Amino acid sequence: MNRLIVKYAGYSVNKAYVAVDGQTLKFGKNGECAFETEKSAVTVSVFNVLEAASASYYLWSILYFFISIFGIFDSYRDFKCRKIEAEFIVRLSGETRVTVRNRAFNKKGESEAVSIECDCGYEVVKNTQYIDKPAKRRTRIMTAVRIVLFIGVIVLIAVIAGNL
């Protein structure tokens, strides 16, 4: 039985998921997770899911805008829409430790998404991060809509207060 111990050290902005052979890992408080398998090699994937990439983004964004009292108590979102796609084939022998670290984003274009440190050998299948253009466009449109809604609410409050 081979054992893979994965440690993920990443920026919280990226909110990336780590999966081994398609099974998403849940990390403990120490940032490590163990995965046991009979295979001699496993596929480690690192990816993120952008909120703005979903088809219902506009609906949910408007709903959260009103629930969060017109955006005042809204949670932080990555408005830069950075997409992470990395996949590695890691060869196992006994207990293998893998550390996955996020890399800084290169503004000039595509860059490596993560760096990996491994006790045994590994092979890079893909390792890119880039800006998701459709998600970025949706984010810009929604930001403009939120600004217009916020100004509309302030005008509505002013009109109601003026009539009293």
Q: In which residue ranges do the predicted regions lie?
A:
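Short loop/turn and low-complexity linker motifs enriched in small/turn-promoting residues
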Residues: 1-164
